[in-house]
Curated annotation (Swiss-Prot):
SMART domains on file: HLH
Protein name: Heart- and neural crest derivatives-expressed protein 1
Residues modified to Phosphothreonine: 107
Taxonomic classification: Eukaryota, Metazoa, Chordata, Craniata, Vertebrata
Gene field: HAND1
Classification via PROSITE patterns: BHLH
Quaternary structure (record): Efficient DNA binding requires dimerization with another bHLH protein. Forms homodimers and heterodimers with TCF3 gene products E12 and E47, HAND2 and HEY1, HEY2 and HEYL (hairy-related transcription factors). Interacts with MDFIC. Interacts with SOX15; the interaction enhances HAND1-induced differentiation of trophoblast giant cells.
Basic residues: bias regions: 92-104
PTM statement from Swiss-Prot or TrEMBL: Phosphorylation by PLK4 disrupts the interaction with MDFIC and leads to translocation into the nucleoplasm, allowing dimerization and transcription factor activity.
């Protein structure tokens, strides 16, 4: 049924004056009348009165996005359920937390290795705190001492004869070994036939520790 045609025909039937030409334009009254007639139908099809929220009447304008999110919940978009978001957040949290744990385990392993190395160095006073670099220097010095013992073809090397040099000395490794050999004059040499070992402590001299602790 053409609403514009019927309206123009009805108006011409009661009034002798000719209809205005603007009344016959379909774009003035056709779409507006169709929207006015079809809007209640589509609103009743989308939201029935039983399903409509109490804040939004059936005949009113459609709700905004913010109001719809407040009514139906924020996670109504497809593919973004709360469970998936929580699982993703948990994986990211575990990834961030694994870095500090690995670094802490590495530090603990290094510290325990240096503690074991300090126990292998003889004649170190119990109240002396050695840094990592000093521990490595003493370990290399003790290894050089043991190599000298083997090179001189002596009997079992006496750990008490090893002196812990904690002072920082200049020069190359060879000069350092020469100085250590000069300081190890008290280390027991190989015994000849009929000779007896002199009793007494031949450990590190106390002045070496005093010089190191006074620095």
């Amino acid at each position: 049924m053409n609403l514009v045609g019927s309206y123009a025909h009805h108006h011409h039937h009661h009034h002798p004056h000719p209809a205005h030409p603007m009344l016959h334009e379909p774009f003035l009254f056709g779409p507006a009348s169709r929207c006015h007639q079809e809007r209640p139908y589509f609103q009743s099809w989308l939201l029935s009165p039983a399903d409509a929220a109490p804040d939004f009447p059936t005949g009113g304008p459609p709700p905004t996005a913010a109001a719809a999110a407040a009514t139906y919940g924020p996670d109504t978009r497809p593919g973004q359920s709360p469970g998936r978001l929580e699982a993703l957040g948990g994986r990211l949290g575990r990834r961030k937390g694994s870095g500090p744990k690995k670094e802490r385990r590495r530090t603990e392993s290094i510290n325990s290795a240096f503690a074991e190395l300090r126990e292998c160095i003889p004649n170190v006073p119990a109240d002396t705190k050695l840094s990592k670099i000093k521990t490595l220097r003493l370990a290399t010095s003790y290894i050089a001492y043991l190599m000298d013992v083997l090179a001189k073809d002596a009997q079992a090397g006496d750990p008490e004869a090893f002196k812990a040099e904690l002072k920082k000395v200049d020069g190359g490794r060879e000069s350092k070994r020469k100085r250590e050999l000069q300081q190890h004059e008290g280390f027991p040499p190989a015994l000849g036939p009929g000779e007896k070992r002199i009793k007494g402590r031949t450990g590190w001299p106390q002045q070496v520790w005093a010089l190191e602790l006074n620095q």
